[in-house]
Amino acid sequence: MTTPAIRSQVPLLHVADVARTIRFYDRLGFVVANSVTANDGTLQWVWLVAGSTSLMFARTEEPVVPGAQRALLYLYADDVAAMHAHLRAHGVDVGPIQTPFYSPRGEFRFADPDGWGLIVAHT
């Protein structure tokens, strides 16, 4: 018997406010591909896409503690310096561009409003 193929993987992260998350990830070029809204009008879930990258976010009733999140999203961009400048211009607290041995063209780190860590590196 052969194992059925898995086509892709999409991270699903819990957040306190889906609408706030959409606004934040818009700064990175993500757009809404799909969403679910509760009867009261509150966004409960969203699927965001940017190029071939997909992320899903779902509202949680549990406390979301910034800085305590355990996942790290590694995003690839064509121009790290331009993305760094763009995010700073939009009020995102980004770390400095660094050039570790595994990313000689540079990368930088920051966090989203719920504390999920992100790294942007060159493609």
Role assignments for model-derived ranges:
Residues M1, E62-V64:
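Short, flexible, solvent-exposed loop/turn segments with mixed acidic/basic and small polar residues
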Residues M1-T3, R7-D17, W45-V49, V64-T123:
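Vicinal oxygen chelate
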Residues A5-I6, L12-S54:
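Core segments of cupin and vicinal oxygen chelate
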Residues A38-D40, V64-V65, P100-Y102:
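A short beta-turn/loop motif at secondary-structure boundaries
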